[in-house]
Amino acid sequence: MIHISDAAQAHFAKLLANQEEGTQIRVFVINPGTPNAECGVSYCPPDAVEASDTALKFDLLTAYVDELSAPYLEDAEIDFVTDQLGSQLTLKAPNAKMRKVADDAPLMERVEYMLQSQINPQLAGHGGRVSLMEITDEGYAILQFGGGCNGCSMVDVTLKEGIEKQLLNEFPELKGVRDLTEHQRGEHSYY
């Protein structure tokens, strides 16, 4: 469910050493399955453990996950990265905003999942997003861009060199992607 790197475990163990005996960590998702989902880590004293929690035992600690958050933390990774600028704890949870879909789910659901979990987080750095409008009978994914992508001069490159390549690599049954967006350049456009 969740992978916690050795460096992150050591970081948590150091923090937990200063807490009440028996205190562990809790990993959770607020507003799971929505565009506003946010992940977090907190201390979990012994009296805060619920019977319905999942206990994930690691070498240096135990991480508790509540029943509601569990499916949205599938494939989550926690790491502690140190570079010349300092140290940082990172939590990546690709399924926090949308529950992972089965490999045999309809093509529309699998494409939508990939857009939400892999493509949109990349576009969000520029204030953009993409939505799947339909998949045609001919096998084309019809997409609509929004936010900073609408009117951006790089949208064609993003569509063909980024999104289309990733989708065709993952879903060979697709023939390509098409952009439905009526692009209007403005203050919102990234480039």
From Swiss-Prot:
UniProt GO BP: iron-sulfur cluster assembly; protein maturation
Cofactor: [4Fe-4S] cluster
Record key words, sorted: 4Fe-4S, Iron, Iron-sulfur, Metal-binding
Coiled coil: none
Entry-linked InterPro entries: Fe/S_biogenesis_protein_NfuA, FeS_biogenesis, FSCA_dom_sf, HesB-like_dom_sf, NIF_FeS_clus_asmbl_NifU_C
GO molecular function ontology, one term from the record: iron ion binding
Iron keyword on record: yes
Record text on cofactor binding: Binds 1 [4Fe-4S] cluster per subunit. The cluster is presumably bound at the interface of two monomers.
Highest taxon listed in the record's lineage: Bacteria
Residues binding [4Fe-4S] cluster: C149, C152
HAMAP family xref list: Fe_S_biogen_NfuA
The protein's assembly and partners: Homodimer.
Family the UniProt entry places it in: Belongs to the NfuA family.
Function: Involved in iron-sulfur cluster biogenesis. Binds a 4Fe-4S cluster, can transfer this cluster to apoproteins, and thereby intervenes in the maturation of Fe/S proteins. Could also act as a scaffold/chaperone for damaged Fe/S proteins.
Protein name: Fe/S biogenesis protein NfuA
